[in-house]
Amino acid sequence: MGVTKKPDLNDPVSRAKLAKGMGHNYYGEPAWPNDLLYIFPIVILGTIACIAGLAVLEPSMIGEPANPFATPLEILPEWYFYPVFQILRTVPNKLLGVLLMASVPAGLLTVPFLENVNKFQNPFRRPVATTVFLIGTVVAIWLGIGAALPIDRSLTLGLF
């Protein structure tokens, strides 16, 4: 970082320029073109060079090497697919499970039409959208936690 020149408020000429709104042109260092054309690209290229250098000099494994002859007991998807996986795992009819998954975006598309006359931005003045959001969040968290548990405890989360 460089040191910028501050205005001298004891100087009457500087005070007159600042009073007219002209002071910003006469002190300091402008951001254009110095910072944006010269300093920022060097910082960005230096960061990329450091990351590339570390990747070449110290490569790290992404995960355990795959063993095609040993499969895990239970295959789990990535964490962001847990609620969908739980729906498919607990619903006995697979077509019903797929329809339940498709109903989530369809239900979210109907929320703006339920409150189309309500123009408030405050969530407390839009009760339908707030309720749908809160219930959807609780259900998604419930399903996500349940997907990580065994099937017999997945719906109750082992609490009941």
Swiss-Prot record:
TM spans, by residue?
36-56, 95-115, 131-151
Q: Which GO terms describe its biological process?
A: mitochondrial electron transport, ubiquinol to cytochrome c; photosynthetic electron transport chain
How does it sit in the bilayer? Multi-pass membrane protein
Q: What is this protein called?
A: Cytochrome b6-f complex subunit 4
What is the protein's species of origin? Psilotum nudum (Whisk fern)
The compartments listed are: Plastid, Chloroplast thylakoid membrane
The family annotation for this protein states: Belongs to the cytochrome b family. PetD subfamily.
Q: Which gene encodes it?
A: petD
Quaternary arrangement and interactors, per the entry?
The 4 large subunits of the cytochrome b6-f complex are cytochrome b6, subunit IV (17 kDa polypeptide, petD), cytochrome f and the Rieske protein, while the 4 small subunits are petG, petL, petM and petN. The complex functions as a dimer.
Respond yes or no to whether keyword Repeat is given for this record.
no
Superkingdom of the organism of origin: Eukaryota
